[in-house]
């Protein structure tokens, strides 16, 4: 299957933009009997499928790669520069956008009397549920959204309960390294996930997804979780990290993770928490 991955830096930028905008009043039309939705955000596409609304989707972005059948939908382009012409050609009633899409493009969509919802990553883990509810409201799947949220909360609670009985492991979750060191700092939802999974986030004192090499070396965590770099495999990224100064001085175990699952807030966030728990648990 063709895979569309975001660069670590692009993932970080996407997480910094923390916006949950309501449906735009401009260009709104009455709720149609048949919705046609274009999703410009991967986690939104995943959520629509999880809520059983896949039949409403008529278009997606290049990065909407899960579930696999989503890739059969027409793509309107990238997250940050979708084609207005392509969007309009699909005759959608609703466009659900990420915060990357230029305001002028969304304004043009609204001028075509198409409803626009701009939605992006949330600052807290709890915000994941808000995102699911927002999408459920748009596609009239409110009860399905609440059911999904209930199932996710049960899974999260089970993981937290188990993690609470186990020793903590010091963890550093990295999205980039080298000239720019990016990590899950204390002001991020991934910090919450590390803590829920039984880890002690050594980058808790950092902000805005950035951390210093000096502090990382000083903290010397037990486990480093590393997102694969653009165009590189998990193994290649880990090898580069381990052989690059000053990271090569660290004694930590280094493990990779699938950023598509872990960094996308949506229906797979409980699964992502289980992944983080399992990675941490292997170091106890």
Each predicted region: which residue ranges?
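His/Asp/Glu-enriched short active-site or ligand-binding loop at hydrolase and phosphoryl-transfer sites
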Residues: 61, 186-209, 255-256
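Flexible loop/hinge segments that line or gate small-molecule binding clefts
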Residues: 66, 101, 105-134
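Short helices/loops that flank or line small-molecule/ion binding pockets
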Residues: 84-91, 111-112, 212-223
């Amino acid at each position: 299957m063709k895979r569309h991955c975001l660069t670590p830096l692009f993932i970080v930028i996407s997480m910094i933009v923390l916006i949950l905008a309501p449906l735009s009043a401009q260009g709104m039309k009455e709720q149609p009997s048949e919705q046609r939705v274009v999703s410009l955000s991967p986690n939104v596409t995943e959520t629509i499928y999880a809520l059983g609304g896949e039949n409403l989707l008529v278009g997606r972005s290049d990065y909407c790669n899960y579930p696999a059948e989503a890739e059969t939908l027409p793509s309107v382009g990238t997250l940050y520069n979708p084609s207005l012409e392509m969007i309009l050609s699909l005759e959608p009633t609703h466009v659900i956008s990420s915060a990357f899409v230029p305001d002028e493009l969304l304004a043009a969509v609204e001028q075509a009397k198409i409803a626009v919802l701009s939605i992006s990553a949330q600052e807290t883990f709890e915000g994941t549920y808000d995102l699911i509810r927002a999408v459920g409201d748009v596609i009239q799947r409110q009860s399905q959204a609440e059911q999904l949220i209930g199932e996710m909360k049960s899974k999260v609670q089970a993981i937290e309960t188990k993690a609470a009985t186990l020793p903590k492991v010091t963890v550093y979750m990295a999205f980039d390294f080298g000239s720019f060191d990016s990590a899950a700092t204390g002001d991020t939802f991934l910090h919450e996930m590390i803590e829920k999974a039984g880890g002690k986030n050594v980058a808790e004192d950092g902000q805005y997804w950035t951390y210093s090499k000096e502090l990382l070396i000083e903290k010397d965590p037990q486990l480093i979780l590393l997102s694969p770099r653009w165009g590189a495999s998990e193994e290649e990224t880990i090898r580069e990290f381990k052989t690059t100064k000053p990271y090569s001085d660290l004694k930590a175990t280094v493990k990779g993770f699938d950023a598509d699952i872990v960094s996308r807030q949506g229906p797979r966030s409980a699964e992502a928490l289980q992944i983080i728990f399992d990675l941490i648990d292997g170091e106890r």
